[in-house]
Design a protein with these regions (language model features):
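Non-catalytic substrate-recognition and accessory regions of acyl/acetyltransferase enzymes
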Residues: 1-20
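Polar/charged side chains located within well-ordered beta-strands of beta-rich proteins
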Residues: 13-16, 27, 46-49, 63, ...
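A conserved beta-turn-beta hairpin within the catalytic core of GNAT-like acetyltransferases
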Residues: 17-28, 37, 92-95
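A short, internal acetyl-CoA/4′-phosphopantetheine-binding micro-motif in the GNAT/acyltransferase core
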Residues: 29-37, 65-66
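Conserved acetyl-CoA pyrophosphate-binding loop and the N-cap/start of the following alpha-helix
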Residues: 36, 40-48
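Conserved active-site alpha-helix within GNAT-family acetyltransferase domains
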Residues: 43, 67-85
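Conserved catalytic-core motifs of GNAT/GCN5-like acyltransferases
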Residues: 64-65, 80-98
């Protein structure tokens, strides 16, 4: 597997290149450890992710977030990410949002 995982004590995230378009980063697996939630660590983790994205010379990044995940959307918005599109996911039985940022 080509997945690259980054971990801090407060949580972790993964970054992969979009197949056939290696200047786009696909960000996924972002989570804050449950024991330390609601303390601002999402923002700490996101700042670390943004540094990694820039150091890897990506031009654009995308991620998905379930519409009901208000905390994650707050982190994305504060980091300069933009809502792009929403769709209904049959697997999750709820709406999922696609977010992106130009780096």
């Amino acid at each position: 597997s080509n997945m690259t995982r980054y971990a801090l004590t407060c949580g972790a995230f993964e970054i992969d290149s979009l197949p056939s378009q290696c200047q786009i980063a696909v960000c996924h697996g972002f989570y804050v450890n449950p024991a330390v939630r609601k303390q601002g660590f999402g923002h700490v983790l996101k700042a670390e992710q943004m540094e990694v994205l820039q150091s890897l010379n990506y031009n654009f990044a995308i991620c998905t977030v379930v519409s009901s995940n208000v905390a994650q959307k707050k982190v994305l918005e504060r980091s300069g990410w933009e809502f792009m599109r929403k769709f209904y996911s049959e697997r999750q039985d709820e709406h999922v949002e696609v977010w992106g940022i130009e780096l």
